[in-house]
Amino acid sequence: MDVIKISPRGYCYGVVDAMVIAKNASLDKSLPRPIYILGMIVHNKHVTDAFEEEGIFTLDGSNRLDILKQVDKGTVIFTAHGVSPEVRRIAEEKGLVAIDATCPDVTKTHNLILEMKEKGYHVIYIGKKGHPEPEGAVGVAPEIVHLVETEEDVKNLDIQSEKLIVTNQTTMSQWDVHDIMELVKEKYPHVEYHQEICLATQVRQEAVSEQAKKADLTIVVGDPKSNNSNRLAQVSEEIAGTKAYRIGDLSELKLEWLKGVNTVAVTAGASTPTPITKEVIRFLEQFDHEDPSTWTTEHNIPLKKILPKVKAKN
């Protein structure tokens, strides 16, 4: 089968940095144990499973404050998605060692919100409800940040302020953000724009929007909780016009999707381990509709191959 390996795809620098920070923590014998990650360090189950083998445990829950209630001692790692100042304060009050793996692009948004608060602004924040990144951003200044996800959310806004700015979650579809921003502009003509789609997300979406047009089908390799992975599938269908499926790894690929398909495009979310994506590509390249011996969708990547290699500190 012909395979279009969409480029760029896969890991972004924020994800790699977060994983290296957590991996270094696992090797640092001076850190108090146990070591916990507040939520998924990045949204990929293969990564969290690999860290568990390294002795770092992922705690999950509805929000970061609830997760933090589960921890009474040891070390906590804040994920790439960022956390609110309240989470940081409570971790300190509990006497926990805190390690910050927040993506620099997310930190930039937090700093923008703080700056706008000091200037007397209200902030309309476009993001996915229930996702940890908006949770942290809203938590920076909950009294002035208004989270919107849908057209209905914009209609329900009631902000009485001449100082108003609109920004967004870094991993949203740039087309979705544009549409919501236009609705906000209609309602509040005086609003200022500050689009925060991170460059890695933007170039991956643009690559899919162009390169997937040449394919009969797009496979996005990414975790179901990965917002940027889900958005890549959306971009393939809505912008490139190519049917797309998201899979966590090769074992989730269904052969019936490949019926009548001659060319398939493959991309991966920013939190998807490269070996997982390569395994999918290898399978598709050798796949033959007429040869059942090429039809086995068995995932065989060991967890020890998932995490980046770092040197132990002396």
Curated annotation (Swiss-Prot):
Q: Binding residues for dimethylallyl diphosphate, per the UniProt record?
A: 43, 81, 131, 226, 228, 271
Q: Is Iron-sulfur given among the entry's keywords?
A: yes
Under the cellular component aspect of Gene Ontology, which terms does the record hold?
cytosol
Q: Report any one BP term from Gene Ontology.
A: isopentenyl diphosphate biosynthetic process, methylerythritol 4-phosphate pathway
Where on this chain does [4Fe-4S] cluster bind?
Answer: 12, 103, 198
Q: Which residues form a coiled coil?
A: none
- Write out the GO MF terms: 4 iron, 4 sulfur cluster binding; 4-hydroxy-3-methylbut-2-enyl diphosphate reductase activity; metal ion binding
Reaction catalysed? isopentenyl diphosphate + 2 oxidized [2Fe-2S]-[ferredoxin] + H2O = (2E)-4-hydroxy-3-methylbut-2-enyl diphosphate + 2 reduced [2Fe-2S]-[ferredoxin] + 2 H(+); dimethylallyl diphosphate + 2 oxidized [2Fe-2S]-[ferredoxin] + H2O = (2E)-4-hydroxy-3-methylbut-2-enyl diphosphate + 2 reduced [2Fe-2S]-[ferredoxin] + 2 H(+)
Active site location: 133
So what EC number does this one have?
1.17.7.4
The UniProt entry, under Pfam families, shows: LYTB (PF02401)
Q: Where does isopentenyl diphosphate bind?
A: 43, 81, 131, 226, 228, 271
Q: What cofactor is this protein dependent on? A: [4Fe-4S] cluster
Tell me which UniProt keywords the record has, alphabetically. Answer: 4Fe-4S, Iron, Iron-sulfur, Isoprene biosynthesis, Metal-binding, Oxidoreductase
Give the residues the record marks as binding (2E)-4-hydroxy-3-methylbut-2-enyl diphosphate.
Answer: 43, 81, 131, 170, 226, 228, 271
What remark does the entry make about the cofactor? Binds 1 [4Fe-4S] cluster per subunit.
Pathway this chain belongs to: Isoprenoid biosynthesis; dimethylallyl diphosphate biosynthesis; dimethylallyl diphosphate from (2E)-4-hydroxy-3-methylbutenyl diphosphate: step 1/1; Isoprenoid biosynthesis; isopentenyl diphosphate biosynthesis via DXP pathway; isopentenyl diphosphate from 1-deoxy-D-xylulose 5-phosphate: step 6/6
What role does it play?
Answer: Catalyzes the conversion of 1-hydroxy-2-methyl-2-(E)-butenyl 4-diphosphate (HMBPP) into a mixture of isopentenyl diphosphate (IPP) and dimethylallyl diphosphate (DMAPP). Acts in the terminal step of the DOXP/MEP pathway for isoprenoid precursor biosynthesis.
Q: Which PANTHER family match?
A: 4-HYDROXY-3-METHYLBUT-2-ENYL DIPHOSPHATE REDUCTASE
Give the family this protein belongs to, as stated in its UniProt record: Belongs to the IspH family.
- Protein known as: 4-hydroxy-3-methylbut-2-enyl diphosphate reductase
* Organism name: Bacillus subtilis (strain 168)
